[in-house]
UniProtKB/Swiss-Prot annotation:
The keyword Cell membrane applies. It is a single-pass type I membrane protein. Residues 21-50 form the LRRNT domain. Glycans are attached at N64. InterPro entries: Cys-rich_flank_reg_C (IPR000483), Leu-rich_rpt (IPR001611), Leu-rich_rpt_typical-subtyp (IPR003591), LRR_dom_sf (IPR032675), LRRNT (IPR000372). PANTHER family: PROTEIN TOLL-RELATED, TOLL-LIKE RECEPTOR. Binds selectively to the Gram-positive bacteria S.aureus and S.pneumoniae. Does not adhere to the Gram-negative bacteria E.coli and S.enterica. Probably recognizes peptidoglycans expressed on the bacterial cell surface. This is Leucine-rich repeat-containing protein Bf66946.
Length: 265
């Protein structure tokens, strides 16, 4: 085979266009069979649903994506790298990465995140440790709200974390902490008030204190169930009392008839 033919063959193998690629993306397969799905700078407002399951690297930077749900990466178990930098993400479900056991890094820098759940990274971190790999998260240049929800990350950074980068990790709120690095702030400064309302890691409206406990919707359901049960019991008791009272009245009526006209009873 001529040198020219070898060159053309290698070029074809390193840039194979995949038929099942989302319309807003470009899919290529490397010489080693690793698929790269590039959807950067396409004005996307959400993650495409038809990303090929064999994708290894997913590039979604420079778009207008606002949230990551628990189903955003469903079926994409082969992902090793995700680039979501420079979007408008303000909410990430704590279950978004729950199936990504091969993930090496995720870039969430330059978004609009004010808080992030520690649970979000549990599965990728534990999987990386079990496989002897390194897992890294880029979180720089987000408007962090330095309250109780971010205490865990501040503690990680202060301890010299090898998973979370500490560059450009400054507080945006509250005003007293604005501009200060998370790793420099004492744990006692990360406090919440009952008036602070926000979306928790699963998208349920709750106060920061409630975000670490049971979701508000769950509590409301429990209270509603208790009230419904109590009302049902009261209705049953009332029905039983009315039935008993009716039996007594009927018994008295028949007794009276017996006394007056025993021959007709």
């Amino acid at each position: 085979m001529a040198l020219r033919d070898i060159f053309l063959l290698s070029m074809a193998m390193t840039a194979v266009t995949v038929q099942a690629c989302p319309s807003a993306c470009k899919c290529t397969v490397s010489l080693y069979g690793e698929m790269v799905v590039a959807c950067g700078g396409m004005g996307l407002t959400e993650i495409p649903e038809d990303i090929p399951h064999r994708a290894v690297y997913l590039v979604l930077k420079d778009n207008n994506i606002t949230k990551i749900t628990s189903y955003s990466f469903k079926g994409l178990r082969n992902l090793q790298g995700i680039d979501l930098s420079n979007n408008k993400i303000n909410h990430i479900s704590s279950a978004a990465l729950r199936h990504l056991g091969h993930l090496d890094d995720i870039d969430l820098s330059r978004n609009e995140l004010t808080s992030v759940s520690e649970k979000l990274f549990d599965f990728p971190i534990s999987s990386a440790k079990a496989q002897g790999r390194r897992f890294f998260v880029y979180l720089a240049n987000n408007p962090w709200g330095c309250d109780c929800r971010m205490a865990w990350l501040a503690q990680e950074l202060a301890g010299g974390s090898k998973t979370f980068g500490d560059r450009h990790m400054e507080c945006a709120t509250p005003a007293a902490l604005a501009g200060r690095g998370l790793s420099e702030i004492p744990q006692t400064s990360f406090v919440c008030t009952g008036r602070d309302i926000s979306f928790d890691s699963d998208g349920i409206i709750a106060t920061p204190e409630e975000s670490t406990a049971f979701p508000v919707a769950y509590k409301v359901a429990v209270v509603f169930g208790c009230i419904t049960g109590l009302v049902t019991i009261l209705l049953l008791v009332l029905t039983a009392m009315l039935y008993q009272k009716r039996r007594i009245r009927l018994g008295s009526k028949y007794e009276l008839r017996w006394n007056k006209h025993p021959e007709f009873v």
